[in-house]
Amino acid sequence: MLSKNLISSALINVVPGFSNADTQVLEAQSLDTILELLTNLRSVEFPCAILEGRSNGAIQLVEGPVDFFTQSVWIMGQFGRGEDESDVYADTHALAIRLLAKLIQMRNAGEPALEGWDWRRTQYMKRYGGQNARGWEIVLSFTENISLLMPEG
């Protein structure tokens, strides 16, 4: 993944609600893995960010070609009974905007070149009831091969 540290730093330093990179910034290689993480809600502290790599050949058949120049960041929140899901979308939208602003600021300070971004609303609903997770997927595009920027080890 493009430095989990980069995204974690951006979230922990400027986005309210994020304080623990170990429980709130998660990693996955495909949509199925993300949904599996969200199904086990006990292991997820909301709000959370899930970094989805696209450089794993296993996702090629389902989600398109292996890609070393983009990375998805999912910003997710949850709502319970009596709460309005539109509030969760609004809250996670605000978190996503703050994250993007910080990443652009970091890019201007010399971090890997962020070429652009795209986002869309995404939904997840636990199959057998319980809590709901809602949020946004941000697809970050970089001008460099981010697999070469990953720390060794």
Where would I find each of the regions flagged by the language model?
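Charged, amphipathic alpha-helical segments and their flanking helix caps
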Residues: 1-32, 37-45, 49-153
